[in-house]
Amino acid sequence: MAITKTNFIDYTRCRRYSALENIRKDKLDSKMTIEEYMKENEKEEYRELLESMFESTDDKDADLTKKEDKELSAMMKYYKEVELESAFKSKRLFNGKFVYSENTYNQESFDFVHNGIRYLCYVDIYNENDDEINIIEVKSTTSRNYIEGLKYGENSKEKNDMFILEDGIYKLKKPVNGSDKLIKKFNEKYKKLFDRYSDIGRYVFDLAVQRYIIENDLKSHKINKRVNYYLSVLNHNYVYDGYMVGEKRVYRTINGEDIVSFFDMNEITKEYMPIIESLVDTLENNIYNPDSSPCNVGVHCSYKEKCECKYKNICYKDLPEYNSSFNYIGFTDRIGLGPDKYNKYDLINNGYYKLDDIPIEWLQNKPNMLIERECYDNDKIYLDKEKIIAMFDTLEYPIYHLDFESFPCPMPRFKGERPYTQSCFEFSLHIEHEPGICDKDKDNYVFLADTLNDERLEMVKEIVKRIDPSKGTMFAQNVTFERSRLKELAYIFPEYKDQLFKIAERSTDLLYFIKNNQSIYEELGFDEERSKLVNFYHKNLSGSYSIKKTLPVLSDLTYKNLEVKNGTEALVTYSLYDDMTPDELERAKKNLRVYCKQDTWAMVVILDALRNLVKNDK
């Protein structure tokens, strides 16, 4: 085996990780087979892709990292497209010899041995000319983090860019002769690049590890050429114009924007080297002196993230699946709990695992947390009948229960889309004509794209055909998502703009009924304090109002017997259309229809359950 870039990232999480791996020391300096590396690298790339695609999903329990090889390969083709576009741009920027390939067999590799341990990495794009070597690391994230996420200024109105576009490459620009306050603000943002567990810093850390391996390899071979390090990511400002050659999409430069953006990380990765060297010392000590005894958990665990530590179940064995100390309504690491503002890792490290492990005095001045705790301790239901009734009175019938399924493809597929646009391929609609009057089958319509081609216009036509924009209420769980999709479609198909905007404007959210919406309830005449309170709570919600949690509390309806159980499984199924046999495709479409129909029917059922609850509550 060898310590690859991915191994390095994992083995330096904490002291315990390498001990749990039970590494064989006699294999530490051996060559890793290309097959072993490819398998490991593909998993890492897939994980990165998932992080970017599903960063806004509510399907926190969906584990797509365990999909079959067929599913993994189908999704990975989008990652390979990003690599290919990055290679095209590299050839426009640099001269000399290029080495890149969709197949890791043909990629440039670097390795060296240190204290009996071999370190190894492959390079996505390698460029060499007479003067220098250029290393381009390709990531499927977008430029938004490095452009929008790193803006700084002396006040909220002043926005300076940390990276400035020069000759096709974004380059670091530190403030010169700026005020002390400006320099302080710059440094605060600059530190984010060195936070290996943040969305901004993780890819920089990845490239810094590569630099460490590459420089030691070159040093061992006495190669003294200058080496430049670049990060290539998708350009969040790029809007695809729909141009195709035959059946192939061509991502042309549009208004000066390329589909990928290059960031010069030379200075930053150089500054990282002492940090990496220190981590190497720690890693080697942990390997040669393994200690699997418990250690503190922390941000390095990446708990509940796509990149979470694979030994999470060992270190978090005492944390209950439901009603843990993490599950208090409104609890975030930024807000914290208790006098010391404990984040979730502090809670675990100090022995607070369950909901009732938290001292009740920590919940004072946190009324929703107190409601949750009271329901948990006393096995009771909390219900604000008046607020829910007032919300029902705002509804205008018919109610159009609407749910979209979308595919946030890394590479924009259709005209008007950007990288990771939530491209809709399906919707379900249940029409509730009067309170409780809605037939599961007769009052339902499902539109599903028949192919992977652009069928958005057909979808829009069905929406405006079945939803009257002049009356009724569009209803959704997390209505912001449905509103945003309707408005995006309106701009792409301006002939339907008025109708789609009117539908979006006449909308409300299931969460306003079951949870709250402070501004709406204040408009309805409730005081500020009461408007902030949740309307309903049952201990089985475990602090969450997702439809998957509320449904079993208020009905017998379940997703467990469905082939497609959540939105992420839905989009993966859709993305596999072209890889299926006719029989598989027919079954997949049936499963997608059943799942999407279940989502809107669930809203009908939950709303009716609430209606009956307030009607029967004394």
Which ranges hold each PLM region?
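Charged, glycine/proline-rich intrinsically disordered loops and linkers
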Residues: Y37-D61, L150-D195, Y251-I268, Y521-N535
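Metal-dependent nuclease catalytic cores that hydrolyze phosphodiester bonds in DNA/RNA
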Residues: M1-I135, T141-P175, S324-I329, D333-I381
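Conserved DEDDh/DEDDy metal-dependent 3′-5′ exonuclease domain
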Residues: E102-S109, Y122-N127, I135-S140, K191-F194, ...
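Short secondary-structure boundary/capping segments
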Residues: D26, L150-N155, M244-V250, F414-C424, ...
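Acidic, Mg2+-coordinating catalytic module of metal-dependent nucleases/exonucleases
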Residues: R196-Y203, V209, N228-V233, G242-V250, ...
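Flexible loop/turn segments at secondary-structure boundaries
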Residues: Y17-S18, D26-D29, T142-N145, N237-V239, ...
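Two-metal-ion RNase H-like nuclease active-site motif
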Residues: N103-D111, P398-P408, D509
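Conserved RNase H-like, two-metal-ion catalytic cores of nucleic-acid enzymes
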Residues: E83, A87-K91, I135-E137, G149-L165, ...
